[in-house]
Amino acid sequence: MAKATGRYNLVTPKRELEQGVVFSDLCNFLVTPTVQGWKVYWAGLEFDVNQKGITLLNRLKVNDFAPAWAMTRNLFPHLFKNQQSEVQTPIWALRVILAAGILDQLMDHSLIEPLSGALNLIADWLLTTSTNHFNMRTQRVKDQLSMRMLSLIRSNIINFINKLETLHVVNYKGLLSSVEIGTPSYAIIITRTNMGYLVEVQEPDKSAMDIRHPGPVKFSLLHESTLKPVATPKPSSITSLIMEFNSSLAI
């Protein structure tokens, strides 16, 4: 008599690839409060987010600052002198950076459906909402996204963070200090500063920079300590740190 057995049961992908990414990891942005800020988990990556620099942004915005900071306010008038600009939380800044990392790989690689469509939806969710969960309704997307593809997505996010780490602090020498990503719906600008990354999201035409009639813009600051543990390149010497520092910047 034949007997049913489980001799050749496959090991589930999640158990086999503990360091891999499953689709639900991309659709869950988990935030846990800590003593100094928040711990964020997304796509198998963990970030420690703090509030450093946010009070300073607000003071620059309301013109409550030391005279030595005037240059910083004048350098970013569309942020600090614009009635339509809004200071956001560092959690928002992290979401924008992660969304920018997704959009960056969509532009760099010729991704086919359903992957490109799914990534666009996830990027929009990170950029336009503050919710912790995104419900991807299309089962076809879930079925066709392999563990390998999902792990590559995470690798490309880390590559984007590495790009940010190679930026120079805003300087007088014309060295690259910002990355910009444009879509039909918004323009993202991420700028390296002394404290970390100044993140801004504008209208696609960058109307916030119109001197006469500045348009709306949201901005925030993500302290550099948030991305350092994830980035691959590490500072090699104190010399590189001195070269990066710009004492003229308040942030």
Swiss-Prot record:
Cystine pairings recorded for this chain: none
Keywords, sorted A to Z: Host cell membrane, Host membrane, Host-virus interaction, Inhibition of host innate immune response by virus, Interferon antiviral system evasion, Membrane, Viral immunoevasion, Virion
GO cellular component, one term: host cell endomembrane system
GO term, biological process aspect, one: symbiont-mediated suppression of host innate immune response
Top-rank taxon, per record: Viruses
Residues passing through the membrane, by range: none
Stored Pfam families: Filo_VP24
Localization: Virion membrane; Host cell membrane; Host endomembrane system
Membrane topology qualifier: Peripheral membrane protein
InterPro entries listed in its UniProt record: Filo_VP24
Gene Ontology MF term list: structural molecule activity
Protein task: Prevents the establishment of cellular antiviral state by blocking the interferon-alpha/beta (IFN-alpha/beta) and IFN-gamma signaling pathways. Blocks the IFN-induced nuclear accumulation of host phosphorylated STAT1, by interacting with the STAT1-binding region of host importin alpha-1/KPNA1 protein, thereby inhibiting the latter. Without the activity of this protein, activated STAT1 would not enter the nucleus and be unable to activate IFN-induced genes. Plays a role in assembly of viral nucleocapsid and virion budding.
Self-association state and partner proteins as the record states: Interacts with host importins KPNA1, KPNA5 and KPNA6. Interacts with host STAT1.
Family membership noted in the UniProt record: Belongs to the filoviridae membrane-associated protein VP24 family.
Full protein name: Membrane-associated protein VP24
Source organism of this protein record: Sudan ebolavirus (strain Human/Uganda/Gulu/2000)
Phylogenetic placement of the source organism: Viruses, Riboviria, Orthornavirae, Negarnaviricota, Haploviricotina
Gene this protein is translated from: VP24
